[in-house]
Amino acid sequence: MFKRTNFLYRLNSTAKVGWSSSITFATVGTALSTLVIVPGLSVLFSVLLGRDLSAPDPVRIACASALASVVLGVAAGVVARAATDRWLGVFEQVCTARRFDAAYWLGVSAMPVLLALLTGITNLGVAAAYAGFGGSFEGSLSMLVRSVTLLPLTLMAGICLGVFAA
């Protein structure tokens, strides 16, 4: 389909390796705990800590926690994959062929971006549920919408942070 030197071929190959080596979707329980339960509890604990410390707007804490988890999730995934590739000797081969291979870095980022996006949507859902149960949903709706619109920017920030940290 693609030539081996083609940008899309390299991007697709790298993304496929990331997908096949990810254990997140190994079982339903693994996917639920990795993408929903643990991140949701993290946001909930941040909100409860903010309420305990008498923070004026716990929904803002939930949105900030959700967006920060997206950036850090993507960055951690990119760094972990680059470290694995460095250990296997793949990273040296890629850097020898091209000084900066955008296809490699985008392929490496594909799986962390997907996982962080799912986690971010879940976390913002937890923030919306908290706002709804707290009775301040109308006042927090604009903040939730702004947080959703910031998701692509946080994904790009996570990619950049991961590439520069790797």
Give the label of every model feature segment:
Residues M1-A166:
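Hydrophobic transmembrane alpha-helices and immediately adjacent juxtamembrane helices
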